[in-house]
Amino acid sequence: MTTLATFIFLVTLLFVLWQPKGLDIGFTALAGAFIAVITGVVSFSDVFEVTGIVWNATLTFVSVILISLILDKVGLFEWSAIHMLHASKGSGLKMFVYIILLGAVVAAFFANDGAALILTPIVLAMVKNIGFSKRAIFPFIIASGFIADTTSLPLIVSNLVNIISADYFNISFSQYLSRMIIPNLFSLLASLLVLWLYFRKAIPKSFDANHIKKPIDAINDLKLFKISWIVLVILLFGYLISEFTKIPVSIFTGIIAFIFLILARKSNAVNIKQVIKGAPWNIVLFSIGMYIVVFGLRNAGITLILAKILEYISNYGLFSTILGMGFISAFLSSIMNNMPTVLIDAIAIGQSNVHGMLKEGLIYANVIGSDLGPKITPIGSLATLLWLHVLTQKDVKISWGTYFKTGIIITIPVLFFTLLGLYLTLILF
């Protein structure tokens, strides 16, 4: 059973990351799940349990991405980015900092995938239009992709990993926010510092800001642009209301996304079919399929091994527990993707004989490691692979070697300081 479960998991993961001839990740994961069921590695009751765990998370994620795609077509993100350029007043360093801050805000409210895949092309087009060299463009591109993950901690909806973990351990919106807002600030500050230290020689000291277009010129539909702000306020209230009413957050985000699609239907700036097609529907199938395969590892007793390791680490106190869990999940995410990692770790945490504040430390450190760890390697998250593909299409090629060298140097210190922020949160508040 152990060998078979491990084999099914590794083969499924290989095909998900490799995607031969464009094989869809949803189909691959479901195929792996089907094999796991017919071989007896998982039962039908496991299938229902997995569906119960992931349905809210994945539908929330898809809804948020749908909303962000409409906002992108309207021009909200480009409008925001142009404001950042004007605020920089010709300073390359200020522009670098403001773009990172914008990325952090977008990641918090529209998920890491939305920030990386929507904001990066906008930033790329802007720095090219300004006339930056390839050497000068690289820091802005890496920063846009990096900050999307490192600051996707504060809200449950900021990352699919967050939603999965919060649903698994029944963590409320406000409870999650109270624990992750300080770590996210630590991550933002550490990211700013580390990115600046790493790229300080490549960032231009100044640029000509006279030819940057006005923010108003980025808006493709002024009426829908104004409505967008109302939608954002309602979305935020939806997050809060879902907590007090105990109604799944996906119901609120789904209704808001549907209404927004109806409102955008008459806009010339938004192609509804294109927006709906652009949503990550395959993530729903991928989540269910991949997590069924992961449950096979649980049934085979593999997650119990990790549970024992976590129990051992917890004997050395809260700080060691947080650091250990954070770096374990980061390492696993970097080599086998953060989506299966977060659930494997969550299952192990649930199986471990760790309680109280130590268990809380494990839960949140797992989220932090699974959010930040993927930046170490290109295969750490599906978003990174897609991000690299988008850049290649725009004639910006970043080799896996270059990405790994940059990613590991930048990620490790940021991960440490973010985990330190979690430790301080738990002991002080």
From Swiss-Prot:
Which branch of life, at top level?
Bacteria
- What GO molecular function annotations does the UniProt record carry, in alphabetical order? arsenite transmembrane transporter activity
TM region(s), chain numbering: 3-23, 25-45, 50-70, 99-119, 137-157, 180-200, 222-242, 244-264, 275-295, 316-336, 372-392, 408-428
Q: Does the keyword Ribonucleoprotein apply?
A: no
Q: Extract the Pfam families matched here.
A: ArsB
| Topological type in the membrane | Multi-pass membrane protein
A GO BP annotation: response to arsenic-containing substance
Supply the alphabetized keyword list: Arsenical resistance, Cell membrane, Membrane, Transmembrane, Transmembrane helix, Transport
Which Gene Ontology terms of cellular component type are present?
plasma membrane
Q: What does this protein do?
A: Involved in arsenical resistance. Thought to form the channel of an arsenite pump.
PANTHER family named in the record: TRANSPORTER ARSB-RELATED
Name of the protein in its database record: Arsenical pump membrane protein
**Organism (species):** Staphylococcus aureus (strain MRSA252)
